[in-house]
From Swiss-Prot:
It comes from Bos taurus (Bovine). GO terms for molecular function: GTP binding; GTPase activity; microtubule binding. Keywords: Antiviral defense, Cytoplasm, GTP-binding, Immunity, Innate immunity, Nucleotide-binding, Nucleus. Residues 1-51 are annotated as: Disordered. Residues 290-293 are annotated as: G4 motif. Gene3D superfamilies: Dynamin, middle domain, P-loop containing nucleotide triphosphate hydrolases. This is Interferon-induced GTP-binding protein Mx2. Residues 322-325 are annotated as: G5 motif. Residues 39-50 have a biased composition (Polar residues). Belongs to the TRAFAC class dynamin-like GTPase superfamily. Dynamin/Fzo/YdjA family.
Length: 710
């Protein structure tokens, strides 16, 4: 019988040391003195630092693989009851952890986020396949060149039943009746996925093995690292493999199992170098040394230094195993016999037997160690995993809302579908008009954006008044000479006043039209963005709506521009109500004469224009009227021009867009054409629905997990 997973007493070997070790029966990887209850009983160099999770039995690490299946004797009969109880606790507490992650992986959740896993990497001919064979109890593809051409998820489940296997990839599921079928089915799967050549693929192959002779463990086997392309391989095959490996080992959720032969310089191995690149402190990397029987004499101490973490430090340390070699396979050495030979090798080796005593050697202890590490890793990852699933689910739901519902096939249903789409769009346009749309914290509403342009219009009007004041003397003198008639010196010439007013009001037309243009662009872009938000996935409908928005904008722009120009033509009438003008005139006159009274106190040499008192009187009087009139006109224009813009470019523009959208419903023959989706929209919607479904299932699985403390 081959390997079996159960507690076993093992006689500890006498270590090569001057210190005396009494001979006693203990579990074969327990270290004296034992840790207190609640801590993992782990060998030196790879003691797990955290306390035991609540769902792990305190003596969890006393479970191991029994390579020899000895006859039950008196002492062992006495411990059978406690052993069975311990194993039952294991079945109840530990297996669900691995099953949970395997179920999430089976749902396809790994497409959306990284799951806790153990990834196995190694250079070509490192002995990686032999290690996996020893753990799984089945023969895997072997040979020269690239053998593993797709990531292989190896799910091992210990159960008291007949051996069963199942291989799954793409939409294919193949039940396996006995272990001998595994190698051929894996090769077949790789050829289907990656082709019959020597290329690789990122697509997963899932291999499930259920047997009483395997540990509870899930591993991901990755292609061996190669440096040089051979035969029909792509020239960049080495880069392709590294990219595939890095995709897995760079995830913080992955424990990296790096397989390295004992008979090579560990510093030159590509696998360990890649692991160090993504995990520089070795927090989640375990080194596995293979082929200890091929170590040259005199170099054994170098291997021991590696195992003692003195050569290439890894926080989780190293394990060492001796698996079947090519000669063993040729001689058809069974895995069970290979396990017994491995134990004998370490028991009798003058240098390496201490590693067996320390619990760092043999495949059974490696299996136990990996199971322990995986359980710890899963427990630590569960709270983060729950948050990630929740966030991904929310994002996918929000994204799906943007794509809307599936388009109905029935013509009557299409009408209601289109009505609903237009209704929601029109509601958003209405909110834009009323200044009630929902915006992000860093954004502002449409009405506020337009109001900012109106604020700049106030500045333009104020600047224009100041400009008139600054050149009043020069302008009035010029126009007095041109338009003065028979009136006596000092009288105000109305023609001069009127001409100055018309001239400076005329300079406001272009700024007003530019403000109209800016406001139009703001509204137009906002309406376009709203249309894109609602109709982007319906290319014909979206284009139709964009055209209508463009046509309406052009007409509204022309009407608003005409009305603004009409307003300025009316301003040439130079009119203001007597009651209003009289009040403003008196206030301005009072302000000006008060300022002139102060100015008269200054030396006359600084006011050359005061030499002609009659001219002063005329200029001051016209200045009073110009200031009064421009103040009142500016008030009128400050409101009137924004009124025109807001009415034509926002209010009426929005109303006409809404009516134009409703008119689309009258053309019943074009419903199918209008609702024609972009080629990838249906695919995206389907993808998001599937993603939401599997994330919902994942949330449910976590919720139902009895030991989850999230």
């Amino acid at each position: 019988m081959s390997m079996s997973f159960r507690p076993l007493k093992y006689k500890r070997h006498t270590q090569t040391s001057t210190q005396h070790h009494p001979k006693q029966d203990i579990y074969f990887h327990q270290q004296p003195p034992g840790p207190p209850l609640g801590q993992t009983m782990s060998p030196p160099q790879w003691q797990v630092e955290e306390s035991n999770p609540d769902f792990l039995p305190n003596n969890f690490n006393q479970l191991n693989l029994d390579p020899q299946q000895p006859e039950a004797k008196g002492g062992q009969q006495m411990s059978k009851g406690p052993e069975n109880n311990l194993y039952r606790k294991y079945e109840e507490k530990v297996r669900p952890c691995i099953d949970l992650i395997d179920s999430l992986r089976a749902l396809g959740v790994e497409q959306d986020l990284a799951l806790p896993a153990i990834a196995v990497i190694g250079d070509q001919s490192s002995g990686k396949s032999s290690v996996l064979e020893a753990l799984s109890g089945v023969a895997l593809p072997r040979g020269s060149g690239i053998i593993t051409r797709c990531p292989l998820v190896l799910k091992l489940t210990k159960r008291e039943c007949e051996w069963t296997g199942k291989i799954t990839y793409r939409n294919i599921t193949q039940q396996l009746q006995n272990p001998s079928e595994v190698e051929w089915e894996i090769r077949r799967a790789q050829n289907i996925i990656a082709g019959n050549g020597l290329g690789i693929s990122h697509e997963l192959i899932n291999l499930e093995i259920t047997s009483p002779e395997v540990p509870d463990l899930t591993l991901i086997d990755l292609p061996g690292i190669t440096r040089v392309a051979v035969e029909n391989q792509p020239q960049d095959i080495g880069l392709q493999i590294k990219a595939l490996i890095k995709k897995y080992i760079q995830r913080q959720e992955t424990i990296n199992l790096v397989v390295v032969p004992c008979n090579v310089d560990i510093a030159t191995t590509e696998a360990l170098s890649m692991a160090q690149e993504v995990d520089p402190d070795g927090d989640r990397t375990i080194g596995i040394l293979t082929k200890p029987d091929l170590v040259d004499k005199g170099t054994e101490k170098g291997v021991l230094k590696v195992m003692q973490n003195l050569t290439y430090h890894l926080k989780k340390g190293y394990m060492i195993v001796k698996c079947r070699g090519q000669q063993d396979i040729t001689n058809k050495l069974s895995l069970a016999e290979a396990t017994r030979k491995e134990t004998m090798f370490f028991e009798t080796h003058p240098y390496f037997r201490i590693l067996l005593d320390e619990g760092k050697a043999t495949v059974p202890l490696l299996a136990e160690r990996l199971t322990t590490e995986l359980i710890w890793h899963i427990n630590k990852s569960l709270p983060l995993l729950e948050n990630q699933i929740k966030e991904k689910h929310q994002r996918a739901t929000e994204e799906l809302q943007q794509y809307g519902d599936d388009i109905p096939s029935d013509e009557g249903d299409k009408m209601f579908f289109l009505i609903e789409k237009i209704k929601v769009f029109n509601e958003d346009i209405g909110k834009l008009i009323e200044g009630e749309e929902i915006v992000m914290e860093t954004e502002s509403r449409l009405c506020n954006k337009i109001r900012e342009e109106f604020t700049s219009w106030i500045l333009i009007l104020t600047t224009n008044i100041e400009k008139v004041k600054s050149i009043l003397n020069e302008e009035v003198s010029k126009y007095e000479k041109k338009y003065r008639g028979k009136e006596l010196l000092g009288f105000v010439n109305y023609k001069t006043f009127e001409t100055v007013v018309k001239h400076y009001l005329g300079q406001l037309i272009d700024p007003a039209l530019k403000m109209l243009q800016k406001a139009m662009e703001i509204v137009w872009q906002t309406f376009k963005d709203t249309a894109k938000k609602h109709f982007a996935e319906f290319c014909n409908l979206h284009q139709t709506v964009q055209n209508k928005i463009e046509d309406i904008k052009t007409k509204q722009m022309a009407e608003a521009a005409n009305l603004i120009q009409l307003q300025f033509r009316m301003e040439k009438l130079v009119f203001c109500q007597d009651q209003i003008y009289g009040v403003v005139l008196n206030k301005v006159r009072e302000d000006i004469f008060n300022s002139m009274g102060k100015a008269s106190e200054t030396p006359q040499s600084k006011q050359p224009f005061l030499n002609d008192q009659s001219s002063i009187s005329s200029i001051v009087e016209i200045g009073v009227h110009l200031n009064a009139y421009f103040m009142e006109t500016s008030k009128r224009l400050a409101n009137q021009i924004p009124f025109i813009i807001q009415y034509f470019m926002l209010q009426e523009n929005g109303d006409k867009v809404q009516k134009a959208m409703m008119q689309l419903l009258q053309d019943t023959q074009h419903y199918s054409w209008l609702l024609q989706e972009q080629s990838d929209t249906a695919t995206k919607r389907k993808f998001l629905k599937e993603k939401i479904f599997r994330l919902t299932q994942a949330q449910q699985a976590l919720y139902e997990f009895p030991h989850f403390k999230g």
